[in-house]
UniProtKB/Swiss-Prot annotation:
Family statement drawn from the similarity comment of this UniProt entry: Belongs to the bacterial solute-binding protein 3 family.
PANTHER family: AMINO ACID ABC TRANSPORTER PERMEASE, GLUTAMATE_ASPARTATE IMPORT SOLUTE-BINDING PROTEIN
Chain's gene name: gltI
Keyword Lipid biosynthesis annotated: no
Localization per record: Periplasm
CDD domains: PBP2_GltI_DEBP
Protein name: Glutamate/aspartate import solute-binding protein
Gene3D superfamilies referenced in this protein's UniProt entry, alphabetically: Periplasmic binding protein-like II
SUPFAM superfamilies: Periplasmic binding protein-like II
Function of the protein: Part of the ABC transporter complex GltIJKL involved in glutamate and aspartate uptake. Binds to both glutamate and aspartate.
Matching SMART domains: PBPb
Origin superkingdom: Bacteria
Keyword Zinc on entry: no
Pfam families assigned to the protein according to its UniProt record, in alphabetical order: SBP_bac_3
Amino acid sequence: MQLRKPATAILALALSAGLAQADDAAPAAGSTLDKIAKNGVIVVGHRESSVPFSYYDNQQKVVGYSQDYSNAIVEAVKKKLNKPDLQVKLIPITSQNRIPLLQNGTFDFECGSTTNNVERQKQAAFSDTIFVVGTRLLTKKGGDIKDFANLKDKAVVVTSGTTSEVLLNKLNEEQKMNMRIISAKDHGDSFRTLESGRAVAFMMDDALLAGERAKAKKPDNWEIVGKPQSQEAYGCMLRKDDPQFKKLMDDTIAQVQTSGEAEKWFDKWFKNPIPPKNLNMNFELSDEMKALFKEPNDKALN
């Protein structure tokens, strides 16, 4: 997929949302907040096609469940720095480049569909969890694929640079399944590989699979199957060793979740018609998500 907008040309006004009171201390030298204050701009990473978390709608506006969190964090930064007119730049990122671009300072944080796990914590820091998912399979309805055991000797697609790619390769090696694993650039490319018949199944986080199904020409032709191979926690990603910025992000997320606002966002993006095709994902709030909204935390689940 080609980037539809240059990274430096996308400007967005962050939407207002319920905000937590941030730490009143001045930004620490060298911190993300200090960088933002000095430059007069906050640079936010986003995904292009992670429906319904972070993606372009029909007007090329970045929208989604995770983007609502991102907007709330931007508003909290404006309040913290007393800069209501702070410039906001949005840049598109992928599963492959999100960590390097964060580390080299290209963007300040991102809320998308990034799993917080122990391995990634060596490279980046994560906010409180914003979503909990399970990794499953999207396949043609009524076909032969009902669970992961049916993938033996079959072609399976997965998005490159994701934890699902790691899991699928591990499963293939440990179970001697002789799968032909296709690594696609992004979730949209993964689904097109499935849709074209080049793969019999697409392995990914269940909520993202529901998003790809909702975008399909004929959503009813596809079903999500299989016992979850892992449970994963999505968090907003920021640079390591920046406790002040992490606290601002965590406080904002906790306020949104405990106030009931996050559940409204969930209903908006997972239980109602959404762009670009006004299709309903019909994805119910899980017990894990209900528990998260009651007690926000930043625990990695794997």
